[in-house]
């Protein structure tokens, strides 16, 4: 057995006055009671051997970055091995109570204890309002205090075994989780355990991380014996948990402290990057009831992304593990190119739900747990050895000193340094006096709109010129400019109700306007296109003199013919073949490119003009003809067909 389970005596436990030790303090008091065996600290954890089946069990004992293990893994015996031989134990559970537990009660229990113990710093402010449930004392009253309400009678052991005998392991796991979420009067989830393989040394880090969250949940939410200092103690534990999530493993510049605090308050809020929250209700609610939790609230765990840790910490882990393997096996037995986090990090995704998660080697797991397991350091002695609490406490004190010195100035930094050096100093005052760090700016995402000041600046820079300068550049007369400026000012006025017609009102259409309309109608709004993508705009030609249209001899050239409807000199340019070229030449000149309908329109207009010009010759009074309205005469004048009607 390469990785056995260690034991620790209660007389070697040295706790501090830190509120993070309140859970371990309450458990130690329960263990030291002379009427509540066992007296050993680790004996109350109920360590047992278990076997779990997994398809990747062979990768634990025969990793690909160790040459000797890789060669041994090619045998039939290693290939058939799919069982994980593990040690497993649970943390002692804590049940919330409503009655107050005073300092005198616990001191009297310790005074009657025959087991020697060190200073536990028992004060009302350090006593959690709860009772420890020891595995060996299921039928006895806990030592902390008795609850005011009697507990409901639980099912007997025989009936419970008969009820769960027909269920699979995953069904039992889900049933235990549902039972814990519905009742939820206990702190530790029974499904969370400390598990490690005693053959390969791989540790189930997901279980330790969730047990840490269960304990921190109680330290943050449960009140203390002293109601005055309860809020301060809870605030200190909450700040410590926020610091672990923000600064301990991840890059603290990736998100602000406000975001990490939002995760502590509610799981419905958006979580910071590199951190995912599992399904469940509020994880850390400062206003949660100390005695019981609503049935709708379940344990909510923040998953730890081991691949997203800081690059400096990742390099430290790889180098430390490489040095350990070289010292243990020698450099010839290690395949250095394959020694990377992707290879020594194992993940179980299927099978038994209880062991699904991240598994890491013992050396790496111990290095990571040193950074956050200060509140549970003595509960990890069976897996990491008796030296782990001292190393974890040293790292915590050094880390607290660095953190406080960087976030405080003057007397605050000196007070924090003194508190970090002396374990008997009260840490709560330092945490309360510590100012809140200034939130760091986050990079703006693409979906984020620009700020109001920046948008206003862009609008000012891209503003249009004034209306007066625009009117000056139109090239209008002075009367028109004055009218436009006057009209625009009247439109801006709130008392303006009537509109005045502009002197530049619409006039009768000219021949050019009518020609453009006819061309637009015939072409359906499209321009003519020719081979080689050559565009030839419709050219404007002056109409032939009216005397040519009125001459009978020249009208023969304009006689409508179905075979040749348009004279040759007025044919459409689409009858011409224009050669295509990669470089389009200048458009050739074509004679009067009018269409067929356009030609008939002009012919009709000339006939109307001829009739109107010949009618005064049959009247005695040529200039007194009133058969035509001024509107009609004005339209004929706009056609510009008027000539000398001397025929």
UniProtKB/Swiss-Prot annotation:
<feature type="region of interest" description="Disordered">
    <location>
        <begin position="264"/>
        <end position="295"/>
    </location>
</feature>
<feature type="region of interest" description="Disordered">
    <location>
        <begin position="612"/>
        <end position="647"/>
    </location>
</feature>
<feature type="compositionally biased region" description="Basic residues">
    <location>
        <begin position="435"/>
        <end position="445"/>
    </location>
</feature>
<feature type="domain" description="HTH APSES-type">
    <location>
        <begin position="282"/>
        <end position="395"/>
    </location>
</feature>
<dbReference type="GO" id="GO:0000122">
    <property type="term" value="P:negative regulation of transcription by RNA polymerase II"/>
</dbReference>
<dbReference type="GO" id="GO:0005737">
    <property type="term" value="C:cytoplasm"/>
</dbReference>
<dbReference type="GO" id="GO:0003700">
    <property type="term" value="F:DNA-binding transcription factor activity"/>
</dbReference>
<dbReference type="GO" id="GO:0000981">
    <property type="term" value="F:DNA-binding transcription factor activity, RNA polymerase II-specific"/>
</dbReference>
<feature type="DNA-binding region" description="H-T-H motif">
    <location>
        <begin position="318"/>
        <end position="339"/>
    </location>
</feature>
<dbReference type="GO" id="GO:0051321">
    <property type="term" value="P:meiotic cell cycle"/>
</dbReference>
<dbReference type="GO" id="GO:0070314">
    <property type="term" value="P:G1 to G0 transition"/>
</dbReference>
<keyword id="KW-0346">Stress response</keyword>
<dbReference type="InterPro" id="IPR036887">
    <property type="entry name" value="HTH_APSES_sf"/>
</dbReference>
<feature type="compositionally biased region" description="Low complexity">
    <location>
        <begin position="493"/>
        <end position="502"/>
    </location>
</feature>
<dbReference type="GO" id="GO:0042149">
    <property type="term" value="P:cellular response to glucose starvation"/>
</dbReference>
<dbReference type="InterPro" id="IPR051642">
    <property type="entry name" value="SWI6-like"/>
</dbReference>
<dbReference type="GO" id="GO:0006995">
    <property type="term" value="P:cellular response to nitrogen starvation"/>
</dbReference>
<dbReference type="GO" id="GO:0034605">
    <property type="term" value="P:cellular response to heat"/>
</dbReference>
<keyword id="KW-0804">Transcription</keyword>
<comment type="function">
    <text>Transcriptional repressor which binds to the consensus sequence 5'-GCCTCGA[G/A]G[C/A]-3'. Represses CLN1 transcription.</text>
</comment>
<feature type="compositionally biased region" description="Polar residues">
    <location>
        <begin position="156"/>
        <end position="170"/>
    </location>
</feature>
<feature type="compositionally biased region" description="Low complexity">
    <location>
        <begin position="425"/>
        <end position="434"/>
    </location>
</feature>
<dbReference type="GO" id="GO:0005634">
    <property type="term" value="C:nucleus"/>
</dbReference>
<keyword id="KW-0539">Nucleus</keyword>
<protein>
    <recommendedName>
        <fullName>Transcriptional repressor XBP1</fullName>
    </recommendedName>
</protein>
<dbReference type="GO" id="GO:0071470">
    <property type="term" value="P:cellular response to osmotic stress"/>
</dbReference>
<feature type="compositionally biased region" description="Polar residues">
    <location>
        <begin position="138"/>
        <end position="148"/>
    </location>
</feature>
<keyword id="KW-0678">Repressor</keyword>
<dbReference type="InterPro" id="IPR003163">
    <property type="entry name" value="Tscrpt_reg_HTH_APSES-type"/>
</dbReference>
<feature type="compositionally biased region" description="Low complexity">
    <location>
        <begin position="264"/>
        <end position="282"/>
    </location>
</feature>
<feature type="region of interest" description="Disordered">
    <location>
        <begin position="485"/>
        <end position="508"/>
    </location>
</feature>
<keyword id="KW-0238">DNA-binding</keyword>
<dbReference type="GO" id="GO:0033309">
    <property type="term" value="C:SBF transcription complex"/>
</dbReference>
<feature type="region of interest" description="Disordered">
    <location>
        <begin position="425"/>
        <end position="455"/>
    </location>
</feature>
<dbReference type="GO" id="GO:0001228">
    <property type="term" value="F:DNA-binding transcription activator activity, RNA polymerase II-specific"/>
</dbReference>
<dbReference type="GO" id="GO:0043565">
    <property type="term" value="F:sequence-specific DNA binding"/>
</dbReference>
<keyword id="KW-0805">Transcription regulation</keyword>
<dbReference type="GO" id="GO:0045944">
    <property type="term" value="P:positive regulation of transcription by RNA polymerase II"/>
</dbReference>
<dbReference type="GO" id="GO:0030907">
    <property type="term" value="C:MBF transcription complex"/>
</dbReference>
<feature type="region of interest" description="Disordered">
    <location>
        <begin position="138"/>
        <end position="170"/>
    </location>
</feature>
């Amino acid at each position: 057995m390469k990785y056995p389970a260690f034991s620790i005596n209660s007389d070697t436990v040295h706790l501090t006055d830190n509120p993070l030790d309140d859970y371990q303090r309450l458990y130690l008091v329960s263990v030291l009671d002379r009427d509540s065996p066992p007296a050993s600290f680790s004996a109350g954890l109920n360590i047992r051997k278990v076997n779990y089946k997994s398809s990747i069990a062979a990768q634990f004992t025969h990793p690909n970055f160790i040459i000797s293990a890789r060669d041994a893994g090619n045998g039939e015996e290693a290939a058939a091995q799919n069982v994980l031989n593990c040690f497993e134990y649970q943390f002692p559970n804590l049940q919330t109570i409503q009655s107050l537990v005073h300092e005198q009660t616990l001191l009297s229990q310790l005074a009657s204890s025959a087991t020697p113990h060190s200073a536990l710093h028992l004060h009302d402010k350090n006593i959690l309002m709860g009772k420890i449930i020891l595995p060996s004392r299921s039928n006895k009253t806990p030592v902390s205090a008795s609850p005011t309400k009697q507990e409901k009678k639980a099912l007997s052991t025989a009936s419970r075994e008969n009820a769960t005998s027909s269920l699979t392991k995953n069904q039992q796991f889900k049933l235990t989780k549902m039972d814990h979420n519905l009742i939820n009067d206990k702190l530790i989830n029974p499904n969370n355990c400390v598990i490690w393989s005693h053959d390969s040394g791989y540790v189930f880090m997901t279980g330790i991380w969730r047990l840490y969250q269960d304990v921190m949940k109680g330290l943050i939410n449960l009140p203390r014996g002293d109601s005055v200092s309860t809020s301060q103690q809870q605030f200190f534990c909450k700040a410590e948990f926020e610091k672990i999530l923000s600064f301990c493993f991840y890059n603290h510049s990736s998100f602000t402290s406000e975001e990490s605090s939002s995760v502590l308050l509610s799981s419905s809020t958006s979580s910071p990057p590199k951190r995912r929250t599992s399904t469940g209700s509020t994880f850390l609610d400062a206003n949660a009831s100390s005695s019981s939790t609503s049935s709708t609230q379940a344990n909510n765990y923040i998953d730890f992304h081991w691949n997203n840790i800081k690059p400096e910490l990742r390099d430290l882990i790889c180098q430390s593990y490489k040095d350990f393997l070289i010292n243990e096996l020698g450099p010839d037995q290690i395949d250095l190119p394959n020694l990377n986090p992707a290879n020594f990090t194992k993940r179980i995704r299927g099978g038994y739900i209880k062991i699904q998660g991240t598994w890491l080697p013992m050396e790496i797991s111990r290095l990571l747990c040193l950074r956050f397991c200060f509140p549970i350091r003595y509960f990890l002695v069976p897996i990491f050895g008796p030296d782990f609490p001292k190393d974890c406490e040293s790292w915590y004190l050094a880390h607290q000193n660095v953190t406080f010195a960087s976030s405080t100035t003057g007397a605050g930094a000196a007070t924090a340094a003194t508190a970090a050096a002396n374990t008997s100093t009260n840490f709560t005052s330092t945490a309360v006096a510590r100012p809140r760090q200034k939130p760091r700016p986050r990079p703006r995402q693409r979906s984020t709109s620009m700020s109001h000041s920046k948008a206003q600046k862009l609008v000012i820079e891209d503003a249009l010129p004034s209306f007066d300068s625009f009117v000056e550049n139109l090239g209008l007369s002075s009367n028109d400019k004055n009218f436009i400026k006057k009209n625009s000012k009247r439109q801006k006025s709130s008392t303006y109700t009537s509109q005045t017609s502009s002197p530049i009102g619409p006039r009768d259409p000219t021949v050019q306007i009518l020609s453009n309309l006819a061309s637009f109608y015939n072409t359906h709004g499209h321009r003519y296109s020719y081979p080689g993508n050559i565009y030839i705009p419709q050219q404007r030609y002056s109409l032939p003199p009216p005397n040519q249209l009125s001459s009978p001899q020249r009208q023969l050239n304009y006689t409508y013919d179905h075979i040749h409807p348009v004279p040759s000199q007025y044919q459409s340019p689409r009858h011409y073949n224009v050669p295509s070229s990669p470089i389009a030449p200048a458009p050739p000149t074509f004679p009067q490119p009018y269409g067929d309908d356009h030609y008939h329109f002009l012919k009709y207009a000339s006939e109307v003009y001829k009739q109107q010009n010949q009618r005064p010759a049959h009247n005695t009074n040529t200039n007194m003809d009133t058969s035509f309205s001024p509107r009609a005469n004005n339209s004929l004048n706009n056609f510009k067909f008027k000539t000398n009607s001397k025929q």
